[in-house]
From Swiss-Prot:
E.C. number(s) listed in UniProt: 7.2.1.1
Localisation: Cell inner membrane
Function: NQR complex catalyzes the reduction of ubiquinone-1 to ubiquinol by two successive reactions, coupled with the transport of Na(+) ions from the cytoplasm to the periplasm. NqrA to NqrE are probably involved in the second step, the conversion of ubisemiquinone to ubiquinol.
UniProt GO MF annotations: oxidoreductase activity, acting on NAD(P)H, quinone or similar compound as acceptor
Name of this protein: Na(+)-translocating NADH-quinone reductase subunit D
Gene name for this UniProt entry: nqrD
Organism of provenance: Shewanella frigidimarina (strain NCIMB 400)
Length: 210
């Protein structure tokens, strides 16, 4: 049984020390697409965290009974089943957001973070540690999404969660929204800036030359 210190490290490690987007460069595609609004970024974070945590848990529970030759198929079946459940829940209780997220919830099935943790961690680790690892990686993914989402929605539309923060000129205020921040390429540059900041703060994460 893992002790509290180990569980804490597994839970918090992926947020800064081994962030799946900023340091492993995984899950970038969805980060570019769903961060124009903080609301969609938050829902995507919750969806991916739930899928990663529970897929890790279920795969870890049966890891000793999965033949090596079909392990990827088993992993994808479990992940796909969880994604379908999440998608149906979103359509039932948050239909408008589900429409905004479009295909990106379904594409969690092939998300590198989910697949990577299932194969590299859950297949070799007890259930509780695997579950916490899934939550930790989901939170790490969410930390980047929400950071980018705040900048894009605040300065691109003058609002957060749809609530006006900066009064727009068109409404008699002072702020002129920067429409470029609402385009997917802006997220690419913002994520690049976050990667630079994190690697400046943690130089040990920079790959050795030569």
């Amino acid at each position: 049984m893992a002790d509290a210190k180990e569980l804490k490290q597994v839970l918090t490690g992926p947020i800064i020390n081994n962030n799946p987007i900023a340091l492993q460069i995984l899950g970038v595609c969805s980060a570019l697409a769903v961060t124009s609004k903080l609301e969609t970024a938050l829902v995507m974070t919750i969806a991916l965290t739930a899928v990663t945590a529970f897929s890790n848990l279920f795969i870890s529970l049966i890891r000793n009974h999965i033949p090596s030759s079909v392990r990827i198929i088993v992993q994808m079946t479990i992940i796909a089943s969880l994604v379908i459940v999440v998608d149906q829940v979103l359509q039932a209780y948050a239909y408008a957001i589900s429409k905004q997220l479009s295909v990106f919830v379904g594409l969690i099935i092939t998300n590198c973070i989910v697949m990577g943790r299932a194969e590299a961690y859950a297949m070799k680790t007890p259930p509780m540690m695997s579950f916490m690892d899934g939550i930790g990686n989901g939170l790490g993914y969410g930390a980047i999404l929400l950071s980018v989402g705040v900048v894009r929605e605040l300065f691109g539309n003058g609002s957060l969660f749809g609530v006006e923060i900066l009064s727009k000129i068109s409404d008699g205020g002072w702020y002129q929204p920067n429409g470029l921040l609402l385009l997917p390429p802006s997220a690419f540059f913002l994520i690049g800036g976050l990667i630079w900041l994190i690697r400046t703060y943690k130089p040990e994460q920079v790959e050795a030359k030569g």
